[in-house]
Amino acid sequence: MSDLEHSTTHVEHEYGGSEIQVLEGLEAVRKRPGMYIGSTSLSGLHHLVYEIVDNSIDEALAGYCTEIDVAIGEGDIITVTDNGRGIPVDIQPQTGKAALEVVFTILHAGGKFGGGGYKVSGGLHGVGASVVNALSEWLTVQVHKNGKIYEMKFSRGHVTEEMTVVGTTNYTGTTVTFKPDPEMFEDTVYDYETLHTRMREEAFLNAGLKINIRDERAGKEQSDSMCYEGGIREFVSFINQNKTPLHEDVIYMSGERENSMAEVAMQYNDGFNEITVSFANNVHTPEGGMHEEGFRRALTTVLNAYGKKVGLLKGDDKVSGEDCREGLTVIISVKLTDAQFEGQTKAKLGNSEMRTLVNSIVSDRLEQYLEENPAVGRAILEKAMMANRAREAARRARENVRRKDGLEGATLPGKLSDCYERDPSLTEIYIVEGDSAGGSAKQGRDSRYQAILPLWGKMLNVEKARADKVYGNDKLTPVITALGAGLGDDFDEMKLRYHKVVIMADADVDGSHIRTLLLTFFFRFMRPLIERGYVYAAVPPLFKLTRGKVTRLAFSEEERDAISAELRGENPDAKVAISRFKGLGEMDPHELWDTTMNPQTRTLKRITMEDAVKADAIFTLLMGEKVEPRREYIEQNAFRAANLDY
């Protein structure tokens, strides 16, 4: 528990009803659930679990909870148990009600706001328990406290059974069991892997905290137990497990100031991509903020000063922040009172004092580390200097691309068949594998709003290439120029010429490879394209089934068999003609339009990226240098090959 205690601020008094503050009522939650949990899709469904777990994490941050259990039961009923102090059960002065009832029925009620109950707290603006209650068909909470077991039951935010004592206990803690309300959610089936990924993240962020997760649903049984004494150091090692480290140690730095603390773990690898993952009070901040800014400033300053000191940088030589972060994996975690997040979803941290704190910690500790480990310091600096030279080469290559670039047809790639429409929100570009398929697509498209760009030959695997190679690659340059938005830090969404970028490749191994190469390119060099939801994969059919005048398409063997049986009806001997599409190039323009390009009849899969760390790991695995981990992954996931790219 020493690491956990080091990273939390212990609140030295009882946690009682007087610590619960009430800010406003619950009425709005069921009317506008998206305001409180982001959406009513699967993302929002899983958010319910995170809200309850966040309350348990708060107990861990305060130094009172060492273990959390999360279970998915039959019927997708969730149970979260912790061994904290237990939610208060005494009377809350402001309302005259039991504090337990207040926590679960009144929005913004919790020990989070005045600093009395918790010095540091995560959760979505403190709305947790009551919002989960409002969006649950039913919810039961049991509290072990004062030697007694208290129980209270709710339905859709209302009390159905008052708080009663149901037994005695020698333990303390809270158990919340709930069933999401199908009236509120598009889907109520939980995905174990999604919850497991989030719980693993929480375990990394709270050193020494044990989190158990299990799936008890019939046919889906699995479980895991996670506890990382090394905290975010182990998180960095986990992310880098299929990369080749530049130095063996994960560099760890931490410090405190008043009621705030920050910790940073970092390690370089021999790749070219930066992975920065930041958190504030255990909440992921994908858009960064002041803590990231403080780290970047300190890193650049320290490496330049060190380079001058050891004579690697001479005169006016210097390395940029981008150079310093090439091949870097870093986790930044800060914990603070009164965290200011920009936006309801807490995507960016706004507390300027965190920039100062992180900058100070990294400046002092990193300088000291480099002094004590000169071989590591030299390796890091030489990598940054090499990145600097490559960046200059990339800039020259980029200028060459820019000189040829522009939004008018004359300067666009010769192979591009552009559309007439100029409003990007109405246009789409099909990036098509092979000239023959490209020809059919050109003839079959609606040229008012559909552009076609055929690709041919062997494409560059950008996972193994620096930016200068990408800019100079004759297979990728047409894609860069056609899209018009630039690459990397120069990517400008306002210049994007199409708001649907559709990858159209055969449904075979070669097609999957092309899709993966393109997705790797977009992920590494045009990530906003994926983050904003502009990238799609066309899903061409595999089979055409005909009986008489009725023709149907099937996208899998299972669907083929089901449609075949449906067409035969009550006559099992009826003849159904089944033909297999071997490739896009075999379809005539009319077929390609009907099956793959007509907005009324086609199937498109939007490529999403909810977990950047997981996406990075998969791209590194599938497209990186190490063969053995890739072989293992493919062998383990071969049965899911149909979904591998999505």
Question: Which ranges hold each PLM region?
Answer:
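GHKL-family ATPase ATP-binding module
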Residues: M1-S18, L26, Y50, D58-A60, ...
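Conserved short strand/loop->alpha-helix "switch" segment adjacent to the catalytic nucleotide/phosphoryl-transfer site
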Residues: K31-Y50
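Residues immediately C-terminal
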Residues: D58-E59, G86-I87, V509-D510
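Short conserved segment of the HATPase_c
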Residues: I87-G110
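Helical (often loop-to-helix) elements that flank the catalytic cores of nucleotide-handling enzymes
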Residues: P93, E342-R355, L553-E559, I563, ...
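C-terminal interaction appendages of subunits in large macromolecular complexes
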Residues: R389-E408, D423-E428, G439, Q443-R445, ...
